[in-house]
């Protein structure tokens, strides 16, 4: 009976020692998310970060790194969206000038084109504010990280 108990304890110790560190298991997913951002595949990067959260709840170091990296993903995505909105606005501005050339200010076509241009300008400004927001958020996290020495 004593031998069985000792054998059971030894088996439990061996089984508990063989568990892998969750941080080392989750690290490849974070690296894959980084590669997805380099390739401008933001949906895949977000999905990988979400899978780290759900599949490795005990991998605290990698989860913190993923949390910080998600801000970087959002920042890069916002920069792309801002560039797109800016180019659409510039095209709309040229179109507005072309359509309204020679028409009086009170003409319905001018008014409609002006409203369209205003909505494009608002979208461009919204995207630029989004870029600034994520840039400030990343800068604040870096300041906090330097002060505390933590992730």
Each model region followed by its residue ranges:
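Short solvent-exposed coil/turn linkers within tandem alpha-helical repeat scaffolds
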Residues: 53-64, 96-111, 115
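Alpha-solenoid repeat scaffolds
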Residues: 59-60, 80, 127, 148
